[in-house]
């Protein structure tokens, strides 16, 4: 049997030694970000994505190993463990295969087969299966025993049949093969329930629908499961030949027949055996297989949905920061007014206000004047506008503010406000902004997330940020674990200024956690900013191991040691000293000197502890200490006069922002309160496997309007801007129509009605836009 490390190595395409080293480090309490960045020699430079996969597979395979041990102990206790069975259990490479093998030995409720065996009917069953020339009724007469509850030959045959049915249904190899045959050839079939045609309209694409199981994309799987859960759809699995007439077995029944030597050759027991196979298939085997495939289909779709959510969250967290610029945050609304908050370049709140420029009060000029005064008073450079209800009207308000104050040279940006209301009412917001009304905290969050999306969004439960595909239909624990890993990797990829970071941001740093993060903030508040990384050791609860895990990701931009603002780990400072000695230079002269550093050979400074990969990273950090891997900040410009879906016309070319990436395409905010959909087939001239190959959440893109369905609130977009020149019809071949669907009846793009959450109902994305 292959070791866990070898299995993972084969899956990753890595050496077993690399995996073994990574496993040892993980077991030793080291974090994925730390291992990926500072233990490259040990792992052969496995990156964070590979390490996350390794970590996940390690957990699965260890669970499988433990379950395998439990199964062996259970079967041994029953006195039924044979060398062949032990070998089969050892070779089981999935939990499903292991459970198939264990099924005949699993403790179960009293069954008809067990009762029949206790009545002594096992020999009858074996005789009829082994010698079909036996006449069933005649053989059964010898097993009639009223004292055992077998009063007739028919009762004896019924008991023998129950024994064989259980045997057929618990054959691990047979069930595994039938399951795979059904998976490859089977279909999911959805029908609308009677009387649900109107109330279940959002699932109308699935009212009469079928699709091959193995080809179903995750969003359609979760859509039909949700329709079934909401009692709009009936969902069934079907395969050709699963139902057949008595005496004419279909392919699945024939597979059972072949496995146990049953055939129709005119012998006395043949018809009885064929009916036994038929009953076994229809009442037990098929039922179990369909339950297994339902679970498999959901798990596969769930895995894909979680992956989409994680990818979108990563893109959002690593979106370009506007940086330290005074920002006015506007949380739009009608009746309750537009909430405004000004934060200075450090994110500190310096002013809040509520204005009522829109219906029903329409105090437009007063709002322009008061907000202009705030901008001038606090030197505002950016205006961040939440993208919820009244966003476009508030955008016009901001435009007028800019026009009235040209000397301030301000810019306005529309910002996703998803999750801002959750933050406003959270314990974190109460702790950060105790004197601020809940209604103004959302405006603060909108302003800050423009300055630094990562620093602000870590304060919000990722599930509330609204970039997930069917996030409410997947397993909570699996989703949370994946998203937590994304947040941790993003924060550590960027690094954290230990003197300005909030507690929630520090909590995501490798090795820290909420408790130590709060202690760092308390120590900073009581003693002033940290001057060196070494000073972190004075924080209560921050021991040697925690310091080792965290120090490289914590930055001190204006500290005593220039290295403390870089990603060079303190443990590697001796390497830098050797470089300084060799170059006869001072750190303040060498750091940032790209020309001088690029003349150095990493191999010249490597030793037994710090190899070439680490030295190469050190030199790169010295070139650009504390470099931010996030892209440069830029904004989309919405077209004037295009403010609602009715303003759109096919052929328009517009600029927009990608708000969400799903398996079937990307949603783009083009400024009309309704995101449009760029289907995966309309993203590029070449065939692509995933929309994420082309776009990510937050990207500014230019799109072509293909079609607009105002009543259904559907907007079809294309990123192939020359489609219009071809009559909006892409060429045949590898680039199907933007609205192309699978050959079998399948749903069109999800209906887009209302706010983003409603727009993405069928795509499973939740993103509430607040009023």
Segments (PLM) and residue ranges:
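Long, charged amphipathic helices and adjacent flexible linkers at domain junctions
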Residues: 292-301, 305-310, 464-495, 604-650
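Long, charge-rich intrinsically disordered scaffolds of nucleic-acid metabolism proteins
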Residues: 84, 97, 101, 413, ...
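C-terminal accessory/binding modules appended to enzymatic or scaffolding proteins
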Residues: 13, 320-322, 488-522, 640-678, ...
């Amino acid at each position: 049997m292959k070791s866990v490390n070898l299995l993972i190595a084969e899956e990753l395409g890595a050496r077993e030694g690399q995996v073994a080293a990574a496993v040892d480090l993980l077991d030793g309490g080291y974090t994925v970000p730390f291992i990926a960045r500072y233990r490259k020699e040990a792992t052969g430079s496995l990156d964070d994505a590979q390490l996350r996969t390794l970590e996940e597979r390690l957990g699965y395979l260890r669970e499988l190993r433990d379950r395998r041990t439990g199964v062996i102990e259970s079967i041994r206790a029953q006195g039924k463990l044979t060398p062949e069975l032990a070998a089969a259990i050892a070779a089981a490479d999935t939990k499903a295969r292991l459970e198939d093998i264990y099924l005949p030995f699993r403790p179960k409720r009293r069954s008809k087969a067990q009762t029949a065996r206790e009545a002594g009917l096992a020999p009858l069953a074996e005789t009829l299966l082994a010698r079909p020339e036996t006449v069933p009724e005649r053989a059964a007469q010898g097993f009639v025993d009223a004292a055992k509850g077998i009063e007739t030959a028919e009762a004896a045959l019924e008991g023998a049949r129950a024994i064989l049915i259980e045997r057929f249904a618990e054959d691990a190899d047979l069930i595994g093969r039938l399951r795979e045959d059904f998976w490859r050839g089977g279909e999911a079939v959805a029908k609308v329930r009677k009387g649900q045609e109107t109330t279940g309209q959002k699932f109308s694409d699935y009212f009469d629908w079928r699709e091959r199981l193995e080809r179903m994309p995750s969003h359609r799987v979760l859509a039909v499961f949700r329709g079934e859960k909401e009692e709009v759809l009936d969902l069934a699995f079907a395969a050709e030949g699963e139902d057949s007439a008595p005496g004419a077995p279909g392919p699945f029944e024939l597979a059972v027949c072949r496995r146990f030597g049953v055939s129709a050759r005119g012998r006395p027991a043949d018809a009885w055996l064929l009916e036994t196979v038929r009953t076994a298939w229809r009442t037990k085997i098929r039922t179990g297989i369909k339950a297994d495939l339902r679970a498999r289909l959901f798990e596969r779709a769930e895995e894909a949905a979680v992956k989409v959510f994680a990818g979108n969250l990563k893109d959002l967290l690593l979106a370009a920061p506007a940086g330290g610029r005074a920002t006015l945050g506007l949380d739009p609304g009608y009746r309750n007014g537009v909430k405004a908050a000004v934060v200075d370049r450090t994110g500190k709140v310096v002013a809040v206000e509520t204005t009522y420029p829109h219906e029903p009060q329409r105090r437009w000029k007063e709002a322009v004047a008061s907000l202009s005064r705030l901008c001038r008073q606090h030197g505002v450079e950016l205006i961040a506008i939440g993208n919820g209800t009244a966003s476009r009207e508030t955008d016009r308000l901001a435009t007028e503010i800019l026009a009235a104050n040209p000397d301030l040279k301000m810019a306005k940006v529309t910002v996703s406000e998803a999750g801002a209301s959750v933050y406003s009412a959270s314990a974190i917001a109460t702790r950060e902004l105790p004197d601020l009304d809940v209604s103004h905290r959302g405006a603060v969050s909108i302003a800050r997330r423009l300055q630094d999306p990562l620093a602000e969004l870590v304060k919000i439960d990722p599930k509330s940020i609204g970039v997930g595909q069917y996030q409410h239909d997947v397993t909570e624990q699996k989703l949370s674990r994946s998203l937590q890993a994304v947040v941790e990797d993003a924060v550590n990829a960027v690094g954290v200024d230990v003197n300005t970071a909030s507690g929630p941001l520090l909590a995501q740093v490798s090795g820290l956690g909420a408790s130590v993060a709060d202690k760092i903030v308390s120590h900073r508040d009581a003693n002033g900013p940290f001057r060196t990384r070494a000073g972190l050791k004075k924080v209560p609860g921050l021991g040697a191991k925690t310091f080792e895990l965290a120090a490289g990701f914590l930055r001190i931009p204006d500290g005593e040691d220039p290295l403390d603002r870089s990603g060079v780990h303190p443990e590697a400072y001796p390497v830098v000293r050797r470089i300084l000695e060799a170059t006869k230079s001072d750190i303040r002269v060498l750091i940032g000197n790209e020309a001088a550093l690029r003349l150095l050979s990493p191999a010249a400074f490597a030793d037994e502890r710090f190899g070439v990969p680490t030295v190469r990273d050190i030199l790169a950090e010295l070139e650009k200490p504390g470099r931010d891997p996030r892209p440069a900040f830029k904004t989309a410009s919405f077209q004037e006069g295009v403010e609602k879906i009715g303003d759109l016309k096919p052929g328009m070319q517009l600029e927009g922002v990608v708000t969400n990436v799903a398996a079937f395409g990307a949603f783009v905010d083009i400024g009309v309160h309704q995101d449009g959909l760029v289907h995966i087939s309309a993203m590029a001239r070449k065939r692509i496997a995933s929309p994420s190959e082309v776009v990510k959440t937050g990207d500014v893109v230019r799109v072509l309007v293909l079609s607009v369905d105002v009543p259904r609130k559907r907007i079809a977009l294309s990123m192939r801007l020359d489609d219009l020149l071809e009559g909006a019809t892409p060429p045949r071949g590898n680039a199907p129509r933007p609205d192309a669907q699978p050959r079998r009846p399948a749903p069109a793009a999800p209906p887009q009605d209302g706010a983003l959450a409603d727009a993405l109902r069928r795509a499973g994305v939740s993103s509430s836009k607040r009023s």
